[in-house]
């Protein structure tokens, strides 16, 4: 395991404050990473509290195992947070969880380690998998995907306006030789982008789209939000930190839907409103952003937005 890559936790105090930690509660850190949020949660838990950390990344799991040897109240689980309901069912903890935290996106160690293949800034193997042992790598997928599929990923997940032009460039170049390195792909994408944005690498959006697709990030998020609501106890908190509009849109719509309930689907003259149609969440405060002082030490927090809700039923 590489250890030379550090990670600065975004909205550290704000996220843990939002969970309103109870000393004897059960909490889930759905995106353990390097344990920044988890360590602060443990610092506020009492002897009877428990914290489970989830992560697909083997390097993150190794860091979690080290923390588990230090603190018996902590357990690391090598699974996606999308599967947390299954894990909680197995442990008999559905409806008994006091808080769930999801800090979405890619961690700094993943971005900064060229061998993980997430970044175009440092050349490395074109992988991008958060769990290198599961699924296709980015290189493998690009070798077999159609031009239409590649364009869809660049446009819908990367919000890249030149998605088709870039996809065509990828398909044309792979006929000569396959893509195996991040720098190689970034160079082809940059050449196909006719309008470079000031201060932004022209491959940024396409790389984001490819990463999201390879790791099924949006599908996992939708499943994970439903799972979090299922496992929370009444009064339990859900805090989600997003880093781009696609993630935040899903979180915002989910919370709004659960806050509104489904009473509007019932006939207006119905004398009694069934409990199943009542709201399941209430929002806690307004969306939170990183402070100016945090941005000075961690510029990557600039796009972070946190939404918090509490379970009603």
Curated annotation (Swiss-Prot):
Superkingdom of origin: Bacteria
BP-aspect Gene Ontology terms: rRNA base methylation
One annotated GO molecular function: rRNA (cytosine-N4-)-methyltransferase activity
InterPro entries, per database record: RsmH, SAM-dep_MeTrfase_MraW_recog, SAM-dependent_MTases_sf
Chief location bin: cytoplasm
One family name in Pfam for this protein: Methyltransf_5
EC number: 2.1.1.199
Keyword set includes rRNA processing: yes
Keywords, sorted A to Z: Cytoplasm, Methyltransferase, rRNA processing, S-adenosyl-L-methionine, Transferase
Reaction equations catalysed: cytidine(1402) in 16S rRNA + S-adenosyl-L-methionine = N(4)-methylcytidine(1402) in 16S rRNA + S-adenosyl-L-homocysteine + H(+)
Cellular compartment(s): Cytoplasm
Function: Specifically methylates the N4 position of cytidine in position 1402 (C1402) of 16S rRNA.
Family indicated by similarity: Belongs to the methyltransferase superfamily. RsmH family.
Protein name: Ribosomal RNA small subunit methyltransferase H
UniProt source species: Azotobacter vinelandii (strain DJ / ATCC BAA-1303)
């Amino acid at each position: 395991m590489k250890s030379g890559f550090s990670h600065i936790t975004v909205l550290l105090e704000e996220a843990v404050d939002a969970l309103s930690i109870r000393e004897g509660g059960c909490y889930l850190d759905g995106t353990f990473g390097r344990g920044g949020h988890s360590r602060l949660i443990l610092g506020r838990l009492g002897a009877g509290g428990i914290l489970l950390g989830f992560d697909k990344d083997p390097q993150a799991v190794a860091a979690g195992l080290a923390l588990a040897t230090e603190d018996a109240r902590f357990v690391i689980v090598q699974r996606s947070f999308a599967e947390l309901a299954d894990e909680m069912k197995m442990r008999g903890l559905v409806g008994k969880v006091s808080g769930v935290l999801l800090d979405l996106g890619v961690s700094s160690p993943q971005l900064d380690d060229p061998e993980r293949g997430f970044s175009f800034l440092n050349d490395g193997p074109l992988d991008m998998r958060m769990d290198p042992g599961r699924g296709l790598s980015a290189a493998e997928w690009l070798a077999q995907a159609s031009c239409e599929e590649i364009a869809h990923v660049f446009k819908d997940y990367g919000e890249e306006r030149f998605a088709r032009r870039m996809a065509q460039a990828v398909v044309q170049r792979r006929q000569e030789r396959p893509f195996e390195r991040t720098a190689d792909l970034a160079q082809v994408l940059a050449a196909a982008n006719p309008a470079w944005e000031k201060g932004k690498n022209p491959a940024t959006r396409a790389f984001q789209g490819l990463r999201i697709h390879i790791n099924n990030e949006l599908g996992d998020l939708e499943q994970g939000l439903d799972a979090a609501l299922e496992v929370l106890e009444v009064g339990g908190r859900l805090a989600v930190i997003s880093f781009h509009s696609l993630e935040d849109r899903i979180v915002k719509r989910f919370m709004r839907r659960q806050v509104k309930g489904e009473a509007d689907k019932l006939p207006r003259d119905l004398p009694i409103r069934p409990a199943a149609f009542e709201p399941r969440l209430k929002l806690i405060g307004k969306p939170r952003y990183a402070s100016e002082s945090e941005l000075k030490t961690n510029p990557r927090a600039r796009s972070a937005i946190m939404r918090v809700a509490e379970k009603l039923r």
